[in-house]
Amino acid sequence: MAYKKGQQRLHFMRVLRNLQIYNTIINLFYKSIIESVLCFSITIWYDKLTVKDKGKLKKIVRTASKMKTKVTSLDDLYDRNVIQTVKKIIADEQHPLNDNYVFLRSGRRLALSAQRTDRFKKTFVPKSVKLYNHSVGS
């Protein structure tokens, strides 16, 4: 779905480029129209995509980058959105997942709970804790 919508929006970006519109306007178009389609609920579905589907979405980003646009890779967009989501969950005491995010004694990194099954390891909480800790550590 995101691939199809992204391709449709790329058409309009090509039209803007062919009309020799300033690059700043094309960048703004990419950020507001195409990137917003690609980022819609990316924290939920991006990690579950097959390599083939990720390749299709990355093709849209590559095509946009060839049009002299400043683009952010899908992996970076996913990481950024997951970290933002974790920060929102930590800040909201009423959030159902708030109890899963506990800081270590240092107060900087999050504790990773014990994971007995692969099924749990592949869920949002453990992956988001790892991403958050990696972002804080670097």
Task: Please place each PLM-identified region on the residue numbering.
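Hydrophobic/basic alpha-helical segments
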Residues: 1-138
